[in-house]
Structures are given as structure tokens and as C-alpha cells.
Amino acid sequence: MQLQKPLKIGLGMMGAGLFGIIFGWVLFPVILKSQLKKEMALSKKTDVRAMWEKIPFALDFKVYMFNYTNVEEIMKGAAPIVKEIGPFHFDEWKEKVDIEDHDEDDTITYKKRDYFYFRPDKSGPGLTGEEVVVMPHLLMLSMATIVNNEKPAMLNMLGKAFNGIFDEPKDIFIRVKVLDLLFRGIIINCARTEFAPKAVCTALKKEGATGMTFEPNNQFRFSLFGMRNGTIDPHVVTVRRGIKNVMDVGKVIAIDGKTEQDVWRDKCNEFEGTDGTVFPPFLTEKDNLESFSDDLCRSFKPWYQKKTSYRGIKTNRYVANIGDFANDPELQCYCDSPDKCPPKGLMDLMKCMKAPMYASLPHYLDSDPQLLKDVKGLSPDANEHGIEIDFEPISGTPMVAKQRVQFNIILLKTDKMDLIKDLPGTMTPLFWIEEGLALNKTFVKMLKNQLFIPKRIVSVVKWLLAGVGFVGLVGSLVYQFKGKMINFALSPSSAQVTKVNPEINQQNQPKDISIIGESQNPPKVDM
């Protein structure tokens, strides 16, 4: 039996609709997910691998310095008064070198290299980097703190060494140009032959003090970031490529061949999370992210905050903080013991950086209120000083990121050294940094073309085909039953008429039917 043409068309439309439903709601999500798994893994010759190896645009690296305005009063025990100066803006270019793939366990090893370029045009109004700031002498205060903690009897000798190395300083503060402190370096005179200066300089060289380079004629040079600029980091990092399981992409599993640190206690020595440059796809609001910071020797676990958008792309915002080590059981292993944790919002970096510094959020945001009371001139603001990352959830791409951290030190007070015997003994800020990322138009367009435009096209087509199928289904049903409905309507047997006989009175005469009232005559209307 041959199908009639209208019925064929209807069935064809129904087939198109069925295809739209199967492809749009079943097959396409599977295909998209499979393709994303391939693209997001760190396999060779993919766009993600290329960007992971060398980020093709500069990150924003901003430094904010704290200038101390009441040095004489601080030396007598007064609370510090600070004024923030910044930002000093640097373009930061990041790349990975000495890259090796290991197919057998789906890992990749690499070293890091960063370059920094000062940008006065992007810095704060009028800032050139040649501004002189007054702040606690990080090197002197660090050495005094370490000696006080380990060999307090040696503080007197250290004071004599300071007189030789730093030319008899009148206080524990330094007056220094910003770029000298950050990158160019300040000279430490270790050419003195007296016992105390020579002993201290020998110890500095032997220990390889953080941020120190050694030049001819016993001249040392100290800076905060100079050793990182253009220098290959010696540490070898091992991460998962994510080819076998894309949810493991970028996950740190070893540094220098060691599968855990030997810095903290217990679980805090574990490497948890990615290396911070790549994240797994298919993020949901319930997912807790993890990334490991080798600068701070710890993992961070940002949590979902709210829905956001960036350049027309829907994103999820995740935020993080330093934490409350004393009251969070998961963080107590960062302390020497649970009863020796720093105040809320502070992290002791001595074991990690070999320097008696503390990390916090800028301006002591989300920290113990006492920290703000001990320093004047700080104004914490969640928008300006928090850690936040906006992710595109399907691909796991960070669209916007602002990672901020402040470095602090205790103004050590001890009677065993005249230079610091009257200091307030409180925590005080030194500087804070912001490392920022915002994908430019080129990479946003690339993401849209590869992910969102195909997704939208399929979304339109699947609904269009589903609509065509519905119309075809209705049309086929109408056509199929049209003849039966017409025949049913025109058939004599389909319309039965019931005969109504007039009511007969007692005289066998039909009753009259009254229309209005009791009279056949219309009522008279008075005018």
C-alpha cells in the first residue's frame, strides 16, 4: 500500500523532529563533553597546552607599598601610622620550560620562568618607581627575629654586626626607592672584617638567604622579586595531563620528585589541587576548587559565591581567604601545635619562606579585628582586597582572576638589642601584591567560537526540528482522520431528530402557547 504524498511529508517532518530531539538533547551533549575532554587535557598540539606552556598575554602584577609616617614614635612604642602608595604596575609574562611528557603515568614535568616589566603608564598617578618609601628594614628585622627565636643570647653580637653592615643605623627602618627594593636590589656591605659583621655575612651566604644575590668584593644584593625576574625556578613540578581523566588535569602530584612536602604537619604537607594555571571542566556550584601555591607552600580551596558574567559569557565567581587556623581543624596542621596558631587571617611563613613573615589579605581583610587596631591607616574592602576568580563553568576557563596577598612582620620588642627594645611588638604590614588576569577580546572570541556559537546553533536547530516534528505529527493526524470526520459529519444516521408533539388538553385540542403575559395583545405603554 502506497502512502499518500501529504502523509509522506508529515512522516518526514516527524522524522526530522525525532532527529532534533535525539541529536540536540542526547547526542550533542555527549559529543560536546567528549570534545571538551580532548581539548582541555594537556595533550600536545592543543590550544590549551600551548596557552598552559606560555601564556600569550601579560598578567597584571601590582605592588602596593606601605609608607610609615611616624618612625620616631614607633621607635618609642607607638602604633604605626601607614599610608598606602601604589599601584606600581608590572607586566608579568609566565612560561614553563624544560617540559617533559610521561605517557606511562599521564604526567608532565616542568620548571617555571617569569619576566617582569615595569609600566609607569599603568601605575598610580605620577608614580615612577623612584619614590622613596620608609618602612621596617625587612632584612634587619628578620635576622633579629630569627636569632631571638633560636639563639637569643646572640642578639648583642647581632647588634654589633648591624652597626658594621648597615653603617650604625639609628632605627630599624629603611629609606629606599621602590624599584630598588622590589627588583634592582639594595647593597648589603659585607666587606667589613670585624668579627661580628663577618660572622653574620658568612651565615647569610651559607644559608642562602631568600632574595639575596652575592656579588664580588663581598657585596650582597637584596630584593623582594629580583631573583625571580627572568630566572628559571630550580624546582621541578609534576602535574597530571588529564588525557586519561580530564578531571585530574593540572593536578600537582610532586615537586622535585617528592609526593608531599616536609614543611608542615600531617595532611597539610599534601599537594592538593592544580598548579593554578589550568582547572578541570564541567564545574558546578557545588564543586570546591583546589589549587596549590608553591610560593606559600599550601593549597587553597576557593568556594562558589555567585553568578557573574564577563564580556557576554556567563561565569561563576569563586572566592578564598587565608583562613582561621586556630578554629578550622583542616588548617591546624599549618601550626606548630593547635594552641600555637596565629590570629585569624594570618599565616606564618617562617617554615615555608625561611623568613619570619606572615601572609594575610590586604589591609587585614577578614582577619582578627585586633590587627586593625594595632595599625592606623588601613581600610579593608572586600571588592578591593579579596581573592576572587570568575570561571566559565563548562570549560573551566578562568576569565577574570585577582589573587591578592599582603606580607607582614612583627615589630619585635626585646631588651637584648638596643635598636628594638622599645618597639610595640605588634604585627605590621609591609606591602601587598595583586596578580590579575582578564582574558582579552581575542581569547574571549576564540572561546565563543569554539564553544558557545556551536552550542547556540544546536540549541536553535534542535527546537526548530522539534517544532517541525510536532507540526508534522499534528498534520499527519489531521490528514489521517480527515476523511472519517467528514463522512461522520455528512452521514444521515449521524443526525437524529426527535419529534415533539404539541400537548393536548382535555378537549383533545392543542394548547396555545403564551408568548408574553397572559394576552396575545402587546401591553400598552403610557407615554
UniProtKB/Swiss-Prot annotation:
GO biological process, one term: sensory perception of smell
Extracellular side: 32-456
Positions of glycan attachment: 67, 229, 440
Tissue: Detected in both male and female antennal tissues. Expression is two to three fold higher in male compared to female antenna.
Cytoplasmic topological segments: 1-10, 478-527
Location(s) in or outside the cell: Cell membrane
Keyword field: Cell membrane, Disulfide bond, Glycoprotein, Membrane, Olfaction, Receptor, Sensory transduction, Transmembrane, Transmembrane helix
Membrane-crossing segments per the record: 11-31, 457-477
Lineage top rank: taxon: Eukaryota
InterPro entries in the cross-refs: CD36_fam
Protein name in the entry: Sensory neuron membrane protein 1
Coiled coil: none
Function: Plays an olfactory role that is not restricted to pheromone sensitivity.
Membrane protein topology class: Multi-pass membrane protein
